[in-house]
Amino acid sequence: MSNDSNKSAFIHILLILLASSLVVSAAEMKTVDDFRAAAAKANAVLTIPDWEQTPKAIEAAMKDAIAKANASLDRIGAQDPGKVTFKSTVVALDDVTYEASLAANRATIVKETNTNPAMRTAAENAVKAFQDWAVGIDYREDVYKAIKAFADTHPKLSGEDEKLLTETLRDYRRAGLELPPDQRKEVEDLRKELSKLGTDFDTNIVKSNAPVMFSKADLDGLPESFFASPGIKTGDDVYTVMANVTWQFNTVQENAKNEATRKQLYVIRETLAKDANVPVLNQMLELRNEIALRLGYKSWDDYQTEVKMAKTGTNAEKYINDLVAGIQPKFDSELAELQRLKAADTNDPKAKIMVWDWRYYSNQLNKQKYAVDKEALRAYFPFQKVLDGMFNIYQSIFGLKFEKIVAPHKWIDDLQLYLVTDSATGEPLGMFYLDMFPREGKFNHFAQFDIISGKLLPNGKYQRPTVALLCNFPPANGDAPSLMTHQDVETLFHEFGHALHSIVTRAKYGRFAGTHVPGDFVEAPSQMLQNWVWDKKVLDTFAADYRDPSKKIPAEIVKKLNEAKLANAGVLYRRQFAFASLDLALHDPHPEEMPYDSVAISNPILEKVFLPIDPSTTFVSYFGHLNGYDAGYYGYAWADAIAADMATVFEKAKDGYLDKQAGMKLRREIYEPGDSRDVNESIEKFLGRKQSIEPFLKKIGIGPQDKKKAATAPSQETK
């Protein structure tokens, strides 16, 4: 036998051994059934979602869920008013909405992930049907009367029970149940129409594919790894960039030397879904305003913020406006530095930084002044190592264990399913799916989705949660693994924080479990966790050059990263404040008879608060937060102030961001209660004191001389 034959046989044997080892490891992987006994011991239930496999099954599941829910509502409404109880009314309503939402949550995942367009369409229709039903149950007068009859007995409730009754009655008032029947019906119809339009708005964004062809010369400055990425090279000197794929868009914006290239891609991205969504958004704004006015509110801002920490639209606007003013000196200083770079680059002393320039020149500044090369840094962040490292950190500080288990159904081959247990007691706490890379038709941002929320079930057992993390990190490229940017790593730590918030919940009722907290607080715990990836001690636990794992990120680079972050804070935060400002402005008081022009309202704000734009663009048509976070984007900045304050607990702890005592305190005082108590109480219990704005002002570079301009950032008093 020749040497070649020997080599071939050897390779063949190796492949057989490798394949057999993979079979063994798959066979050894546990299933959810292996944890059911431990769950039962803790009086808990673990549930793998029963995923529908056909469009008809999706539609049937939703119809069945709604029919069962309606039958339960009939039973609540048919009770003798003199015999109603807390359990038979308020708790029963929480049970009904929870059960129906399970089918809607499954449909949402299918809508956002499935590779089959027919499945996605069926799921979209199912979600619309659920949303229509969910609006309608607010107007079940028989159910309302049963709950009101119980409330009129002036029951002696406390804690979470009292909160559930109070907020249920508040929801009815906000739905218009105190209005005359004809006016109430009008509000109901308006809300149903708004719900359908919101689903259309989201779907139009997901469907917006935008391939843009460039030559290699057009893309001068981009790293070779980008050109070698799957799907980029599509012809002889033809490179296709998907403007709707965030990592591709950002890579071009940060690295392309050619301003025309950056502008072209920016304009295309900022006009995605323009024709479909601008009229839809204008209709949504009109409906929101009409609903708010009919319910007795001055604006949709006021309606939305009433149930949040800000309490009024005026408070939210004042907070953002004061931050805009407070950060002005820093923003001006940073902008002047970027303009100097562009002037030198273009030989035009009057060159202005446009909105398609800031990423590129910030990147150049980081390289030149701080020796921070974003592309070079990616070598330290291979996806699997980052994921494993994050798991190790969170398992340690939160007292948890994550174990990969068999997923009975996969909507994509690389889907992963993990089970979470308490590391001390072995109690199963919940499960999470990971769907981490982009593909056509998939949700195109980064988010955690509820599938099964935590809740105390009618049988006395506790339903442990199941969630999904849907992300769009750069895929593997040939022999090179998926390499993440530092921002990607920050995003992963943030989004997985939401998953943990959901999974470890101990709230009794579904409406209070996990991340079901006020919208201007929900981001705070995860924004705090972003601090971890800026800390050398934390990074050393997982970040290493994939080509030589013995090489950690040098301390000097981490130091420069932090310096660059502070140096860019003015630009980055002014951008966030611009989004918050336009969102609030769109939902400000508005004459009922006056049509909306969302672009005419929002584009000038983008220019005034941030940077000059191309007038043909329609940022709002692709700004998904306008459905779901409407009149709520300010909450990122509001929560950021809380997050910066909460981070000080770790910063002062013995082991810093890796401190187990601080981690367990976060789990017990913030994650587990959810919204079962006032979040102000949870925050103060975690801090051990009243809240302070100082850490946030320091974080964004507002010094003592600027504090008067930012004096009304959220404090205990303003909340």
Locate each region found by the language model.
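Bacterial N-terminal signal peptides that target proteins for export
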Residues: 2-13
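Bacterial N-terminal signal peptides
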Residues: 12-22
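Boundary at the C-terminal end of the N-terminal hydrophobic targeting segment
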Residues: 24-26
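N-terminal helix-rich structural modules
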Residues: 28-230, 239-240, 650, 656, ...
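C-terminal, non-catalytic "cap/extension" segments appended to globular domains
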Residues: 32-60, 64, 367-368, 385, ...
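Short His/Asp/Glu-rich catalytic/ion-coordination signatures at enzyme active sites or charged loops
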Residues: 41-57, 107-126, 147-189, 242-278, ...
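Active-site-proximal, well-structured secondary-structure segments within enzyme catalytic domains
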Residues: 164, 193-196, 203, 208-242, ...
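Short pre-active-site segment immediately N-terminal to the catalytic Zn-binding motif
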Residues: 474-492
